[in-house]
Amino acid sequence: GAERYYSEEVIRLPDGWISYAPPSYAPDVGFLPFHRNGFINFGSFNNPKKINESVLDVWANILMSVPNSRLILKYQNMDVEINKNRMIDIMSAHGVEISRLTFEGRSSHVDLLARYNDIDIALDPFPYSGGLTTCEALWMGVPVITVPGETFASRHSLSHLSNVGIPELVAEGPEDYICKVVELANDIARLTDLRSSLRDQMDKSALCDGEKFASVFTTVVRQIWNSWCLGERVK
């Protein structure tokens, strides 16, 4: 519905706009951490620039709705004081104790991926959703809850979740986002099932089918070229 904002013709691919190829060194998916912790660990490994006040308000609401839950925030500069203090101030205003928040900075990529074995549910920021971050969480067996908007940047996770076959994790708005997260946090059987099945499901999905993506993309590019050569409008 955003075609009117583009000066060029928008061409939509049938599945997604990227193909994800997981790194060979990605750790094995671990058991659901809830079973060893006895509480839910939420996580977001997104750029702190994406985590605005509205996002923090919603996440604070979630933490207050899921007793004893924690939130692990990780990014290369997430442990910088200016980022930590901004988030702590907002979350504290909602009654979230600082002890429930963990801020982690830069690490090797393999260690970042391994950290997902301590996360039960990943929280997607909005209106700028995760892209590669969402793919990595899913590959590590961690479900991601997202709320898409109208812009391309706000619909990355929507695309990935749809292509993997779990559109039920896509919320219709902030309130529905909270409801979906809280509901999933209280459904340990569902979380356990996702943990054990998500990587295989993703591996077999359109999101990880590089050959199909390459075939579709090159076909579209050839069609664009042929249309240009014939002086036709690209469709």
Give the residues covered by each predicted segment:
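C-terminal amphipathic helix plus adjacent low-complexity
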Residues: 45-48, 61-64, 68, 73-94, ...
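Donor nucleotide-activated moiety binding/catalytic core segment of transferases
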Residues: 34-57, 76-135
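Glycine-rich phosphate/pyrophosphate-binding loop
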Residues: 1-58, 200, 204-208, 213-235
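Hydrophobic residues at beta-strand termini and immediately following loops
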Residues: 13, 104, 171
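Catalytic binding pocket for nucleotide-activated donors in carbohydrate/polymer assembly enzymes
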Residues: 117, 125-210
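Residues that mark the start of a beta-strand
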Residues: 39-41, 70, 143
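Short, conserved active-site loop motifs that form the nucleotide-linked donor/cofactor pocket
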Residues: 10, 100-101, 167-168
